[in-house]
Amino acid sequence: MGNKIARTTQVSATEYYLHDLPSSYNLVLKEVLGRGRFLKSIQCKHDEGLVVVKVYFKRGDSIDLREYERRLVKIKDVFLSLEHPHVWPFQFWQETDKAAYLVRQYFYSNLHDRLSTRPFLSLVEKKWLAFQLLLAVKQCHEKDICHGDIKCENVLLTSWNWLYLADFASFKPTYIPYDDPSDFSFFFDTRGQRLCYLAPERFYEHGGETQVAQDAPLKPSMDIFAVGCVIAELFLEGQPLFELAQLLAYRRGQHDPSQHLEKIPDPGIRKMILHMIQLEPEARLSAEDYLQNYVGVVFPNYFSPFLHTLYCCWNPLPSDMRVATCQGIFQEILKKMMENKSGDEIGVDSPVTSNPMNASTVQETFANHKLNSSKDLIRNTVNSKDEIFYSISDALKKNRHPFLKKITMDDLGTLMSLYDSRSDTYGTPFLPVEGNMRCEGMVLIASMLCSCIRNIKLPHLRREAILLLRSCSLYIDDDDRLQRVLPYVVALLSDPTAIVRCAAMETLCDILPLVRDFPPSDAKIFPEYIFPMLSMLPEDTEESVRICYASNIAKLALTAYGFLIHSFQLSDVGVLNELNSQQISTTPASETPSHLQKANGNAQLQQLRKTIAEVVQELVMGPKQTPNVRRALLQDIGELCFFFGQRQSNDFLLPILPAFLNDRDEQLRSVFFEKIVYVCFFVGQRSVEEYLLPYIDQALSDQTEAVIVNALECLSTLCKSSFLRKRALLQMIECVYPLLCYPSQWVRRAVVTFIAASSECLGAVDSYAFIAPVIRSYLSRLPASIASEEGLLSCLKPPVTREVVYRIFEKTRNPEFMAKQRKMWYSSSPQSKDWESVDLFDKDAGELNSVECRAEQKQSVEGKKQIKSASKQPEVQGKYAEKDAKLRIPRNPRPNASNTVELRDPVYPEKLQFSGFMAPYVSGANSFIEPENIPLYSFSMDKRAATNPPVASESSLQMNSLGMGSLSVPWMDSMSKSFNLASSVPVPKLISGSFHVGTNPKQFYRVVHEPESRENDQISSAISKFQDLGVSSSSKSASVTSEDASSPADLVGEPSLSRTSVPDSGWKPRGVLVAHLQEHRSAVNDIATSSDHSFFVSASDDSTVKVWDSRKLEKDISFRSRLTYHLEGSRGMCTTMLRNSTQVVVGASDGVIHMFSIDHISRGLGNVVEKYSGIVDIKKKDVKEGALVSLLNYTADSLSGPMVMYSTQNCGIHLWDTRSDLDAWTLKANPEEGYVSSLVTSPCGNWFVSGSSRGVLTLWDLRFRVPVNSWQYPIICPIEKMCLCFLPPSVSVSTTMKPLIYVAAGCNEVSLWNAEGGSCHQVLRVANYENETDVSEFQWKLPSNKVNPKPNHRQNMSSKYRIEELNEPPPRLPGIRSLLPLPGGDLLTGGTDLKIRRWDYSSPERSYCICGPSLKGVGNDDFYELKTNTGVQFVQETKRRPLATKLTAKAVLAAAATDTAGCHRDSVQSLASVKLNQRLLISSSRDGAIKVWK
């Protein structure tokens, strides 16, 4: 094919290249490739992609091309049988009258182009390409095919470094003349540079001894020589081994290429190349022999068969599947590459003992993958992603830069020694990385991942690809990290998916600190490349991305700082800023290179700090700042201080700190005071005392215990480091000491730690001079050493309520009061201070008793006098100095009422003196509910014990407080470790946290306490001991006798009466309409109020949740909602607000729980304006069990986090810990009982009751998560609503300690049930309505069985599956739809009769209708009568004048339409209350109206 033509006519017009080609090929010329003279190469567009067309133009005599076509057919057919080919023959050819066309697929890159393209090939990549080139030649020679023109242009490469050998030259001459270079230039010189890859034996001389035919067959040794030339050029960075003249000289023995090959550092590669280019063809080995002989010398062992087989399996897969499979076997790839390294590679610390993964294992893995779908494969591999990174976590930790690790308290000393506040720069060495982490084979995996990452369709697989790149970056060199991996990671910072952007950010911040060295061209990578690409992240629409940026900004800043320092080191050795000697000699001393460099370095550092400061300010104070972003930024505030230095930390960081505290998020405030200690160490002593200590002082009166504790721990750290001056330290002690009586043990321990640290800092003399007088009133006795935490804890008096503590704080803010108090502290004698509180207690006794109008008032006063007289005895005074104080109890106490002393201590302002508000005989007790007053204490005491305290008794009781001040009694030894009970002493009963010792069955005492949010690990053992004594730890406020408390089953507990959750006792709404809110377009199903009653939210069927400002209810005439949250088309079924937060949880009809936070700035002191800035979406949880039916707050104890209990349409009951996405537990109700329509939980969190849509009520024990009791409501109807019953204190404990609940079901009736036995106590009902049933028809007293003993199978199936309901669904009975419990057992109800009623528990006849329509001619002449039937009390509302007919729904609606008092005009769906200047009632109805009453 053209071997006999000397030259052809030059074709100049490219439009004629495809003129003779049939139009069926659909080819469009794109550009001309190369400078070939024999074949013209052009790039064309085809319907299926780009192709390369090589055109041969016929000139002169006609030539028969059929022989060459036969050779092309043979080559194509032979290579079709290859399983994993490295050869790429021509795919199509066409001969016309004027030309011949050869067509193959276009490849973006060949070896010649790749050698000059960044990122440049690494050593292992070059070996991998050489390995594949030998494999390609081996495949050809095994099929008896020789290429004939192997050169860099004919070696094609994919983006993942898979090699193909193309453009087989079966139509080119085998031999060419030695003395005529024209043939060489015509056939083989495509670049015009006269580079020669032909074997020497392919040149012949005219007239020589041996005559050869130009078309003689090619030999394999000729291809081996060309392969050697290509491999040499590969390792010589693109420099050719031979030009034509050099090759001819080498043929004559006049040229030695070994000198040129000395530039290759690997001797094994040089040896292999020299062996391939020998002059003697017979001395050259076959391609297979070279592959076998140089394994372990040139080619790593894992190349074949492991890595090659792996690539063969990856080639046919799409990008998503490649990443998924790579992730699944990444560990095996790493192990295999780390084994048996070749050459001088450094091994790992210990050999890998696991079995190696061979080629068969790889093939089996991919074969199994092919059996599954792509989605299953991706799912299985993605689930194991954590296994990849656990194995390298230690490596990441070892190789992190020293100043990039988290700064701990122990590191502060070392960090401050590293930190030089004077120079403020250039003080840290650059990033060291250990060499044992090197694994050069990881570059190949990284290249494959980079080639796939742009084509991955699934976002989570793009994320996994980035994380795999992060893993590979641990084992590759710096150049590959910067040139190969980093550009792809940075490009994905603008990915449309948030999780991909977060992963790219994390990977970027993990890769950059690993860099040890970089070229001068990358010295400004941060200011010119990294920071501009990150500039949009502070305004990212997704909060998770901003959080990720904030959590990594400190690491990024310190890494940029390290890069800057390293660039200065490069300039020191003359790499950067080179100046010639003449310029230096003529430059003044002030402008020498060292001075210029230092000035330039300071300018660059200041610019870097300015850039980071702008980012921090945008994250903290920008328009898209959130509490979560701020919290993330605070986690590394110490590293930021280190980066900014002392001056800029004062100038920049200090002014933005108030922005953190202005946020209402309690978690943010807690983290702020946890991390503020790092700022203290960097800004200096003066800044701490002037700016930061006021913040800490403010935190001490915070509502959140974690904030208080973190502030105290910060102070303790500063004291232990001697960072505070004496004056500032004493001021903080005066601010802190009231917290010694705080009800939380966690806070008290933190206060004790601070006081002990302060004492150690001041010394013994100053401690007793300044600290002891301040804290003496809070201690039962003074410890031997104030610097001892254990001693202080053992001497602490019991805690008081939060209300008392906050009043003390208000007093301490008064300068006059503090001046008076200091005079008392430092002027009084020790004796007067010891008993000052006792005198004050006695002084207020009469006032306290006057408040409590009880029959036993006289006895109580006498008891106090006895206590006072006993306290005056010297023996009693000496008792406080004893270490082991014991409670003396007579062996046979007299059972008369005069021995009972009841101490009631409400809060009075005159008792809020530091020296007097804690009486020695007043102690706290374990508690679970909020009180309204100081704890109430009662104890039985024999007069002989009071008058003769030193007398020992066999009935002495030693009680251990077990670390809980609330469990201690002043007489009892706080350091005792066990109970020592004499056999004659009655077992003490702990009722609501108080101890009662006595035998009189009529002696009972009631104690209400403040909950302890933090208790130590010994609480559980204490509770278990009390339970062994027959005492319930969950008991609540109640009056208890020895009879009533004899049964442990009675001590179930009474609900908490929190000030914020339950209306005031005795509150009686008058029915005066305050506001009418009509923004909702459909039914308002539920209302929830905030903890501080500043706002409330409403959930509606119109797919919205609206936020209303409570403070404007009584002020604004036109009242509008402040914020609106949209539920994306689903109905809002139920809602609740998490306690002590602004977070709202809403259950929707599509089964999604929406959780969001309200950005609300409440009105405080000064000129603070109340503001609702927006809604922050926190999370959405799809339960996938149908609509949400019920939703309520759940609090097991004060230690648990915010939890929500909810029920679903598919009979599921779940407890969700809102801090995670998972349920804490899940229970399943019986489907045959219907779905769970209502829930009610106990305040202690030990039990709850569920009501179903078919009238089945079930009591569940949450300790074991099993149903305890289940009973059927008297009629089969849905349980509409349930709530707890708060009985009055006068009721006996046998009743109050049982789980009592109000149940709204049936037709206009509410019943009070004891869930323990399923018995009914009381029924509240409304008469004169249709569908009502006579009372006598129901068996209210005894619970109904759900299933008959031996039912008929057919009837059972019908009853179980309610088949009749499919044909005719039962109508929903009119009745009560909303309940609001009140203290004392009272109840507010609202229902379909459009009325809201108040039912009085103690005096049922005083019940009344708050609001509702009045029937024409009848008026409100309702009265309430009591009946009894089968032992159940019935309270029934009836008309004084009987109605002729029973009321119908139409009659009620007609009356509502004409009512002028503003009553509801549709069913009342929800009730709630808020406490402002007065208590207000909020009600919502099915027509979308919300009404506020007073």
Swiss-Prot record:
Region annotation (Disordered) ranges: 859-903, 1037-1064
Active-site feature positions: 149
UniProt GO cellular component terms: Cul4-RING E3 ubiquitin ligase complex; cytoplasm; endosome membrane; Golgi apparatus; phosphatidylinositol 3-kinase complex
Keywords carried by this UniProt record: ATP-binding, Autophagy, Cytoplasm, Endosome, Golgi apparatus, Kinase, Lipoprotein, Membrane, Myristate, Nucleotide-binding, Phosphoprotein, Protein transport, Repeat, Serine/threonine-protein kinase, Transferase, Transport, WD repeat
Tissues in which the protein is found: Mainly expressed in anthers, pollen grains and pollen tubes, and, to a lower extent, in other tissues and organs including seedlings, roots, stems, leaves, flowers, pitils and siliques.
InterPro entries, A to Z: ARM-like (IPR011989), ARM-type_fold (IPR016024), HEAT_type_2 (IPR021133), Kinase-like_dom_sf (IPR011009), Prot_kinase_dom (IPR000719), Ser/Thr_kinase_AS (IPR008271), Vps15-like (IPR045162), VPS15-like_hel (IPR055231)
The protein's Enzyme Commission number: 2.7.11.1
Lipoprotein recorded as keyword: yes
Disruption phenotype: Reduced male gametophyte transmission. Abnormal pollen grains with unusual large vacuoles. Reduced pollen germination rescued by phosphatidylinositol 3-phosphate (PI3P) treatment.
N-myristoyl glycine-type lipidated residues: 2
Residue stretches of each HEAT repeat: 383-421, 480-517, 524-562, 610-646, 648-685, 687-724, 727-764
Record's catalysed reaction(s): L-seryl-[protein] + ATP = O-phospho-L-seryl-[protein] + ADP + H(+); L-threonyl-[protein] + ATP = O-phospho-L-threonyl-[protein] + ADP + H(+)
WD repeats: 1079-1118, 1127-1166, 1184-1226, 1231-1270, 1276-1323, 1371-1409, 1466-1494
Modification after translation, per record: Autophosphorylated.
SMART domains noted in UniProt: S_TKc (SM00220), WD40 (SM00320)
Coiled coil: none
Subcellular location: Cytoplasm; Golgi apparatus, trans-Golgi network membrane; Endosome membrane
Residues reported in the UniProt entry to bind ATP: 33-41, 54
Membrane topology: Lipid-anchor
Ranges annotated as biased composition (Low complexity): 1037-1047
Function in brief: Serine/threonine-protein kinase required for cytoplasm to vacuole transport (Cvt) and autophagy as a part of the autophagy-specific VPS34 PI3-kinase complex I. Required for pollen development and germination, probably via the modulation of phosphatidylinositol 3-phosphate (PI3P) formation and vacuolar organization.
Subunit description: Interacts with VPS34. Component of a complex made of VPS38/USL1 and PI3K main subunits such as VPS15, ATG6/VPS30 and VPS34.
Listed name of the protein: Serine/threonine-protein kinase VPS15
